[in-house]
């Protein structure tokens, strides 16, 4: 297990989790320098990505101290063991699995379980979630985040799914503590064509928009 520790301070500098799914280690090698340079501090590699263990290990070797590096799509204990063996500093799940959550809490590994209804969200939080992942976020939009925060103002929410430059601040203003962004950030066409200049512009536009908002509300 990796000894590097997840940094909440680093996450809060730019509370966006970039979600990488299905990329090769070569693509990750090309993308991460641009991602870090834009100011992002947290990255998630989903476990259904081929050779994800090597990707996580490479990222830790190259970006330890610069990035929070986590594993996503962790659904059961076997997935958790795989993620922790690779060195994941935090865990993201699409569901609430009590065994996974209790083990993460026992090991002081931040866990972001997926939930949707008020009951699921409260259960996830009560089991020790770092934040509760709201997925799919676009189905009910920012208004749903605001509605959930009304009775549960103490619960930190991280919407995931369909978040892009046009709506990211709407979710933040509704009360989100963080955002999870995948394909809207890691444009597949740009990556396949190795259009690093355009991808850099996209990274910087997203990062700067969220940073500016945080400065305004600080």
Tell where the protein language model's regions lie, with residue ranges:
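Conserved N-terminal beta1-alpha1 strand-loop-helix module at the mouth
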Residues: 1-86, 106, 166, 193-215
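Structural preference for beta-strand elements that scaffold enzyme active sites
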Residues: 15-17, 42-44, 66-70, 89-90, ...
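Glycine-rich beta-to-alpha transition loops that act as phosphate-gripper elements at the mouths
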Residues: 21-24, 71-77, 93-96, 113-118, ...
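Catalytic cores of alpha/beta
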Residues: 76-86, 119-127, 164-179
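Histidine/lysine/aspartate-rich catalytic loop segments that bind and position anionic ligands
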Residues: 94-139
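Glycine-rich phosphate-binding active-site loops on the catalytic face of alpha/beta enzymes
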Residues: 94-100, 134-142, 176-195
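Short, charged, surface-exposed secondary-structure boundary motifs
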Residues: 100-104, 122-127, 142-147, 167-169, ...
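A charged, well-structured terminal subsegment
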Residues: 148-151, 200
